[in-house]
């Protein structure tokens, strides 16, 4: 991942996810860490609420999943999970197709929520919208601001 190709907002979320991963002593940064960081973000919480999503339920699912991840005592920096890496690349491609100079947090969030990891499949059982609904909402929000 190249942080210089991401917005400040996404950089903060990625750093927060890394710190969560380290706090839990997990060997790789994965969707659970990212979603813990995403769900702390007011803008993402607002979008989910507007889509009639129970954010607290998603937080509970995320926390439960985080607690079940393998941990180790290694002091090495964690690696990036395959699903996060693939989601990042797909979101970067999407942002370029839209003509964006930087990858924003909302685009990565949307792509990652609909990837094939077992965690995001579990999360999707707790939402009532599809990827198109989420992308439409994000595009309306992003058109008003370049901070995402």
Where are these regions (language model features)?
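Histone-fold recognition with a strong bias for associated Lys/Arg-rich disordered tails
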Residues: 1-148
